[in-house]
């Protein structure tokens, strides 16, 4: 039966005496553990010194008790240990602070915290910063004696006056509910942090070594990049395919990335789990190599995710495809290579909110096309030709929006994407892609839907500055200007592809 314990304990009892006090019956032999699903230790020296200064202020203000936060623990049945669900950053920082004050037997710092550049750097850096403030002075004078006396009083205050609220549960799901609630009231974590924790809990049938490898792979990617990837790309694609406006990914809508759990038994769930298992089985075998066939794609952007390990594979799969799409290097990647349109966009149209929105529309539509129609391996010439034609259509669709605004913001962009705008070429590209069974049917539909722009339609100030009307007012004199083979005006590609009319 699941149990829940609420208590208050001092830092000294918890970290030095391994005891949680101030509850019906003190809990002894509390072995704190930082589980694999935890984020790296990311507090910087500034955070650590700020905590120290707050404690000193509380002590100097004669506060009898100083509440320093909440610690959420999951008591595991298998190892009789207490996994830190929330509060890791403070616990490690307090451990470093007490070590700098002379304690050398703090269990949290003795356990293996998996190898990570953040852990290695921040733990060492923060300890050094704290030691410079509170460590024993080498000089033998009155000032050093006074400093030592003050630090002994500070150490006593930290151990016996600084308190934590402790929540202990034997139900890991309940622990994470408290965790979500805490972060909803305080500084929220990135949604992908919550998803990481959720899917790691679904991996109880995976070995510890494999779990550690998955976590390391995840943490190798910049957390800011992951936040951008989920919030601006995966989330928006899912909403737009469904015909919804895409606002902000947060804790209230991350359910769309939780997916089908291992315990789900409905026909709907079994269908998607079976499809994943089949793809995994084929790709893990020698069949693709021996037969020369293509790998089977285990994922689709507009279908449910399988919870657990597949979620991390899904993330890596689409993150790599997106980086490939965004990298126009001639000799790297499979999809966009040395594309003349993308060269112009990369060189001249990356700065500014409007250009950023438009490029995101271009990238996400290409990502959805690749996901639906491009083979992962062994593309044919027909595959490549169809893809390159789609890139032109995706560019015309996205940059028709940019050309029709002097200042473009998200409200106008969302209306354009939904097909609610009065601007030329407003329609939901994502729904259109998702409805097509073949790339040829998609390209035919786009050929019917896309219309050319006229001089009167073009409002983009930067684009207008790049050309001058000739004497008869019918042609653009310097639309063809280029440097090092890169055209300066994206409207040139409207003209050469028949989507600009005088």
Q: Which residues fall in each region the model found?
A:
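Flexible coil/loop and intrinsically disordered segments
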Residues: 1-502
